[in-house]
Amino acid sequence: VYIDPPYNTGAAFEHYDDALEHSTWLGLMRDRLEMLRRLLRPDGFICCHIDDSEGHYLKVLMDEVFGRSNYLVTLYVQVRYAEKTLKQDMAFHKQVEQIHVYRKDYGAQPVLTQKDLSFDKF
């Protein structure tokens, strides 16, 4: 399962409020994570995409719902390039977001496909 929940950045969007009270956002996320955990197969994985405005709180919440022993990795995704960002928009632009990856149960293993390295890509 891959989810991209509201980042709770304080912005107003047409279809949802991204400026929730912190405790409201945590409650909303806990409810959804608990539901998703019930829906996951025993060998299932969940990837949750977030930025740093709530990323560290989400990590602790996912530790509680899925268990710290089921945490696999936090991936960091570059979403902007500094040299291509309009500087006048804001003083500081976030360039990296996070994806927290958990498994439902300890024995779950990702299915890895063999890469075809028989040709030169470069």
Set out the residue ranges of the language-model regions:
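Core catalytic lobe of class I
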Residues: 1-122
